């Protein structure tokens, strides 16, 4: 059957919500059942999980280009449907200088890169509700890594290869072109069978992204449909694509492909056997060099923590790695990148002066119940961080350009007397002795505490006395330093705590009422340096709707 005939039976393109192409079929998902009184014998109409689907056998006359034409029409409609959700809703928890979504759910940062004089950053977005479904990509640009401007909804889940979500990936700046690589996610049938393909898109002269379709259609041997989040790098004279993967034995591994032209890819092998049973899935890989060392960043899922307070299976890790002359990868020692409550899926980019800068998702895959959901949005990205490799350790520092948002410094005496900062966006720097407790974002009922447990040499972050609705409430970090040096970045409903000059970081969402702006120190009296943080440019298409 011709595609035009199927569209006519479906009630026209405006009645089509998705297009699927499973196993020699063309399936059109519909808003409403078709009005045709009788369908031809070779046409199937069924309700799949509440969605009407019109299916026919795909004939030789139906090309990928014809399917792409339908995908473009769906994409244009999807972009129009997001317009009411591009107006940022006012909310006391909304950050002043972090990136947050105007409405809906934000998750992984994607495509973080410098290209032709500008920094580009994308993020995963479901615009309509605070749920993980049918992901879009939002495109932001910046000249200074501080002030980000909304560009567009770059990619939508409109095509047969990404109908249920434009999943995470990275960007490549090659010659004059900006390429995006991502995982296309589709779900088929009543059992929602997952189908995964690695896809590409390229920016045109108008700044719009044109999908090139799947560049890897089939799974490598020994891997489930859980293979995603392409990172593309150029080493040893060829392109390499790194993918987080799950083996048939349900072990996380790194899958690597190579290519000469970014379009035709060949599978190399799976890496990571030296780590043994290190989680049931790896996702969101990144790879970079720092001070002459190679590093692999990923999100292992299913690693149990020895600490009873840590119950979340979604972890973050960075491993020192090597790649030999044959391109084979070995993973050496590894560490957590962040030891707070809310940090996942980081990506890095290199600045024009050679710094390696990281941005992560300040959230976790299973968290969808934050207080900001009452105002129609959830999650934000982390502050950008500079990475340093020094004396066998990774150090993280707040991006130096963020200092342009700081006020003049104020000296603050921290004691058991509560000082009202009258603001929740600030930068506090202090060195504390063991045996004291710092309270932040405090009023008579709520606060978050940092306890320096002298007996056990533990730094304990406790958010149980906040408005948090979901997730762990205690994190503990073992330290051996004689004192604890802290730099704390706060932004309305988040804390990023840089410990001992960035040797450790704890990133967390902290929800307390708008009037909870007190700070106090119990068990010691110490001078601190305080800076108030000014707002950055709002990263939204439309002004905040109060």
From Swiss-Prot:
Its EC number is 3.2.1.26. It is an enzyme of class 3 (hydrolase). GO terms for molecular function: beta-fructofuranosidase activity. InterPro entries: ConA-like_dom_sf, GH32_Enzymes, Glyco_hydro_32, Glyco_hydro_32_AS, Glyco_hydro_32_C, Glyco_hydro_32_N, Glyco_hydro_beta-prop_sf, Suc6P_hydrolase. The active site is at residue 108. It catalyses: Hydrolysis of terminal non-reducing beta-D-fructofuranoside residues in beta-D-fructofuranosides. PROSITE patterns: GLYCOSYL_HYDROL_F32. The keyword Transmembrane does not apply. GO terms for biological process: sucrose metabolic process. Belongs to the glycosyl hydrolase 32 family. This is Probable sucrose-6-phosphate hydrolase.
């Amino acid at each position: 059957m011709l595609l035009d005939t199927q569209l006519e039976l479906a009630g026209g393109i405006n009645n089509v919500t998705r297009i699927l192409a499973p196993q020699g079929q063309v399936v059109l998902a519909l808003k409403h059942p078709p009005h045709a009184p009788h369908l031809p014998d070779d046409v199937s109409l069924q309700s799949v999980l509440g969605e009407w689907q019109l299916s026919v056998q795909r004939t030789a006359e139906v090309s990928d280009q014809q399917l792409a034409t339908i995908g473009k029409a769906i994409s244009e409609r999807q972009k129009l449907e997001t317009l009411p959700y591009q107006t940022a809703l006012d909310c006391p928890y909304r950050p002043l200088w972090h990136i947050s979504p105007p409405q809906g759910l934000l998750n992984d940062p994607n495509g973080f890169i410098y290209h032709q004089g500008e920094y580009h950053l994308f993020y995963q977005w479901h615009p309509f509700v605070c749920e993980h479904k049918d992901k879009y990509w939002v495109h932001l640009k910046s000249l200074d890594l501080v002030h980000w401007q909304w560009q567009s909804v770059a990619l939508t889940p409109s095509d047969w290869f990404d109908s249920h979500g434009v999943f995470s990936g990275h960007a490549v700046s090659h010659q004059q072109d900006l390429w995006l690589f991502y995982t296309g996610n589709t779900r088929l049938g009543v059992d929602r069978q997952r189908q995964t393909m690695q896809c590409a898109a390229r920016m045109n002269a108008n700044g719009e992204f044109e999908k090139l379709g799947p560049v890897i259609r089939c799974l490598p041997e020994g891997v489930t449909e859980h293979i995603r989040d392409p990172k593309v790098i150029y080493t040893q004279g060829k392109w390499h694509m790194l993918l987080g993967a799950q083996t048939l034995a349900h072990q996380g591994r790194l899958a690597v492909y190579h290519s000469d032209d970014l379009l035709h890819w060949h599978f190399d092998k799976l890496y990571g056997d030296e780590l043994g049973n290190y989680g049931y899935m790896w996702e969101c890989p990144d790879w970079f060099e720092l001070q002459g060392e190679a590093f692999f960043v990923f999100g292992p899922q299913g690693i149990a923590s020895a600490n009873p307070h840590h119950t979340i299976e979604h972890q973050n890790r960075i491993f020192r790695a090597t790649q030999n002359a044959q391109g084979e990868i070995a993973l050496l020692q590894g560490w957590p990148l962040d030891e707070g409550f809310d940090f996942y899926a980081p990506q890095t980019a290199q600045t024009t002066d050679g710094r390696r800068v990281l941005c992560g998702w300040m959230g976790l895959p299973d968290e969808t119940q934050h207080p900001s959901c009452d105002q129609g949005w959830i999650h934000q990205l982390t502050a950008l961080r500079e990475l340093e490799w020094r004396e066998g350790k990774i150090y993280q520092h707040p991006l130096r350009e963020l200092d342009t948002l700081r006020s003049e410094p104020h000296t603050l005496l921290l004691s058991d007397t509560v000082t009202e900062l009258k603001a929740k966006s600030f930068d506090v720097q202090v060195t504390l002795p063991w045996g004291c407790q710092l309270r932040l974002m405090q009023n008579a009922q709520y606060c978050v505490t940092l306890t320096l447990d002298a007996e056990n040499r533990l730094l304990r972050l406790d958010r149980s006395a906040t408005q948090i609705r979901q997730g762990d409430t205690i994190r503990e970090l073992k330290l051996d330093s004689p004192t604890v040096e802290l730099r704390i970045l706060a932004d309305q409903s988040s804390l990023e705590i840089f410990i001992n000059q960035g040797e450790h970081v704890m990133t967390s969402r902290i929800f307390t009422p708008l009037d909870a702006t007190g700070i106090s120190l119990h068990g010691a009296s110490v001078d601190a340096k305080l800076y108030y943080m000014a707002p950055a440019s709002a990263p939204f298409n439309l002004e905040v709707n109060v």
